[in-house]
Amino acid sequence: MKIITPSYDFIDRDNLMSPEKKIETVGRLCYKSEDKITDTSAEPFVRGLISRQHHAMLEHATLILGASEQAYKDIRFLCDEYEDEIQLPSFIRHTWCPQTRRHVLSANIRAWRNLVKFSTSLFSKFFFPEGFEGFLHAYPILFGDLAPVSTHVRYGQVYQLTPSDLISPKEKLAHHPLTVKFTVDIAVARELCRHRLASHAGSSTRYCDYANGKFGSEITVIAPEESIDEQFVRAARYAEEKYMAQRSEGKTPEIARSCLTLSTMCEHVMTATLGQWKAIFDLRALDSTGKAHPQMKEVMLPLYQECVQTMPDVFGEV
């Protein structure tokens, strides 16, 4: 049995990964198959996720569009009039910035796919402004399985933006994504999932076989925030023994996991906009609504402090 301290790491903080590679990076963490990542592995992995309709992983990649007034109205019309049919329209975020005099729209890949899929089935044509067809064709792995796109050209126009193109704090808060991998225990990971506007992924105890050599045939637990005492060690070792006994009897990992302790290590990935992170820090690092759990604060406070240091224009006023 290993005992480690909790920690966090950024995933693609500088937004240099392609959407496909970022989806693969997060997705493989769930199955602990990061060793299979190569320069060409993203395409078959992402296509496999889509074919199996494992769309949750698509939420960790964000695409941002600049839009003219007419283009924004067209997209808004679809979201407002057909909210129930499209699903996830609230995940398509919008800002109008007087400084840049532009509309900005952003969403994760799952939300964009829902919008495209519904539009093509409803209108037979893709009822979107000029520029959107090229945007979709630029990502054939992500959108190529949907109905053939025939763009209904209107007066509006859209163009793709990157996070570095976001100028004002308002745009950054609404559209800039930040993905963080937390190495915490199962209890803290469960608390993180309560932030429902964020997207989540985590190492799965259904598929991670701790009796396998990949894990050293042992479990890893997170040390308590205060101190490690004999009772904690004994309880964790007992859980490990019972888990291994279940596996040796032929029980699958998804059944044997019922023996695991809440202190078992979990790698949990969380993607949210900077605005959402700001609200999360307010609750989990700064105790705005009461004292945060010590083990949650143990990772959230240093993460918040690093974000303040690197992005003071966004986080300096939390």
Summary of predicted features, one role per range:
Residues 1-318:
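Family-specific signature for flavin-dependent thymidylate synthase
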